[in-house]
């Protein structure tokens, strides 16, 4: 499943295609959304927001389209009039004069008013988004030490969207490698230096992935361009200590780590 950085980049692509342009045609597959087709035609997409792995498409009339891709959903941008070659099932089409965005295969799609946004179950449950520039390491540290999260092992905590939205398995693996910790640790057991390092890494690595992942420069490291240090690198040499990276399973997900330098 895509993680926060990939979802945010997808939102950026959608915004670049249709933001601020009048919608010339709107189509929804689900019957409960059909009444909104006429209400949205002629309106503008004002912004596309991410909350972890959910997308919120905000319209100029105050409505917001909530969508969660889950495992199978995918957005596409096409030229208006183009007929995509795909076997996927179309769920949403938002069309402007020159560009059209399409949502395929997703099933978790709703139209929300401003009031409903504040009471939506997923949006109420999800924690602060790691890509929200307003979120600080100090706030992350406070969440780590809060009664709700301080006794949770990192193996599960770093996959819990209620803790921090936008984290996922590759980020969990890379963050814990960066700070030299295993997934069995809990925040309550860390010293001050470890807490500070983890609080920064929980923001720095997702943000680095968002801004630079996919740019090719294998000589760069965290702090310059993002690339995997341990994820999918089992059997390879750890660049930090020379140990051999191993693969196991934690919280029912593949976990990659270096037993020599992650303690």
Swiss-Prot record:
Protein name: Endonuclease 8
SMART domains: Fapy_DNA_glyco, H2TH
EC number in record: 3.2.2.-, 4.2.99.18
Reactions catalysed: 2'-deoxyribonucleotide-(2'-deoxyribose 5'-phosphate)-2'-deoxyribonucleotide-DNA = a 3'-end 2'-deoxyribonucleotide-(2,3-dehydro-2,3-deoxyribose 5'-phosphate)-DNA + a 5'-end 5'-phospho-2'-deoxyribonucleoside-DNA + H(+)
Domain of life the protein comes from: Bacteria
InterPro entries: DNA_glyclase/AP_lyase_DNA-bd, DNA_glyclase_Znf_dom_DNA_BS, EcNei-like_N, Endonuclease-VIII, FPG_cat, MutM-like_N-ter, Ribosomal_uS13-like_H2TH, Znf_DNA_glyclase/AP_lyase
Active site: 2 (schiff-base intermediate with dna), 3 (proton donor), 53 (proton donor), 253 (proton donor)
Obligatory cofactor(s): Zn(2+)
Pfam families in the record: Fapy_DNA_glyco, H2TH, zf-FPG_IleRS
Species in which this protein is naturally found: Salmonella newport (strain SL254)
Gene from which this protein is expressed: nei
Cofactor note: Binds 1 zinc ion per subunit.
SUPFAM superfamilies per record: Glucocorticoid receptor-like (DNA-binding domain), N-terminal domain of MutM-like DNA repair proteins, S13-like H2TH domain
One MF term in the entry's GO annotations: zinc ion binding
Keywords on record: DNA damage, DNA repair, DNA-binding, Glycosidase, Hydrolase, Lyase, Metal-binding, Multifunctional enzyme, Zinc, Zinc-finger
GO biological process: base-excision repair
NCBIfam families: PRK10445.1
Binding site for DNA: 70, 125, 169
Family indicated by similarity: Belongs to the FPG family.
Renumbered zinc finger spans (FPG-type): 229-263
Function recorded in the entry: Involved in base excision repair of DNA damaged by oxidation or by mutagenic agents. Acts as a DNA glycosylase that recognizes and removes damaged bases. Has a preference for oxidized pyrimidines, such as thymine glycol, 5,6-dihydrouracil and 5,6-dihydrothymine. Has AP (apurinic/apyrimidinic) lyase activity and introduces nicks in the DNA strand. Cleaves the DNA backbone by beta-delta elimination to generate a single-strand break at the site of the removed base with both 3'- and 5'-phosphates.
